[in-house]
Amino acid sequence: MKNIEHIQKRILKSGIKNPKIAVLASGGVDSSAVVSILYDLGYRPTLFYIQIGMDKDGFEDCSWEDDITMVQMLAKKYNLPLEIISLHDEYWEHVVQYTIDTVKQGLTPNPDMMCNKLIKFGVFNEKVGYQYDFIATGHYATTTYVNDVLYLSTAPDPVKDQTDFLAQINFTQVQKLLFPTGGLTKTEVRELATKAQLPSAQRKDSQGICFLGKINYNEFIERALGTKPGRIIEKETGKTIGTHKGYWFHTIGQRKGLGLSGGPWFVVKKDIKRNIILVSRGYDPQDQYGQHIQMAELNNISQSPWAYLGINDETTSIEVCFKIRHTPEFTRGSLRYNAEKSRYELDSQTPIQGIAPGQYAVIYDIDHNICFGSGMIIKGY
């Protein structure tokens, strides 16, 4: 398979003989297929399962007992070493607390992005990963060399592509990362796993935010922040049409869970100081759309999109593709740095729904192949 050949070339290009490879094994089919691919290429990676565990208040992670059983079976099948690493305290401090703090500010968090940046490729590397030449994962992403610079790049399967969840990592991190399954479709991964008789070959994909486990998201928010009843106001008329339990339960663009009749209704704005949710009615209300995004900072993984294009001045407007949420579609737009406002400005060619401050705008080249990085949205209109 082409992607498997790419992984071999990537390792050989490093010039490291007999490289030490760590695999972040979750117990799912993707990371299990990673182990199979590396083993068939002649490598003997060490498997690591990152355990989050349960905190004092009863918040628990995903079905870790089943996960560990799967990883143990995988390690036994290939006679590979396995280590279980507990990063519960670090996960709570860096990811869960970030989520709570972000929601409390009235912003929309991205815990998956922070988990990759701070835990999987951050704390793990500081504790264990630094001893290894490469860290391999089952993410649907690839890496590409352009003029001898390594870039994070998209997977050929747009539905499964996960570069948007990786867009806050840095160059040091991407240099160590291997994505052996990144160039395959999910169907191809399943076929590979079935042929290799992997224990997780038919296991269902995990869904949702991992640290919540079986806890409903709103239940998690309520346990963390409590409730604070407030008004729901129709933006166009200024009339109070309902009540909510707290602005932190709602995000821009939200349709479900408002408890309003005569809809559909969409959240178009939040007044944090007054604890008011503003909504508009209709299947496609214009108030839920915008074409302009502002970001205070831009995290460039390898090089900035301007450097990639050979442009020295970031105030020069350049054409890019971008995403503001995890979808298969890319949006065309222009990006520039506004020196007067100290803001990066992203202007979309078409109106986009639900621009939520706190979320991240992920920036790609116009062919949506290279993922340059991302910036947190501070304003959308």
Which residues are covered by each model-predicted region?
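ATP-dependent adenylation/nucleotidyltransferase module used to activate substrates
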Residues: M1-A167, T187-E188, V267
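AMP-forming adenylation/ATP pyrophosphatase catalytic core
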Residues: A136-T142, Y151-Y381
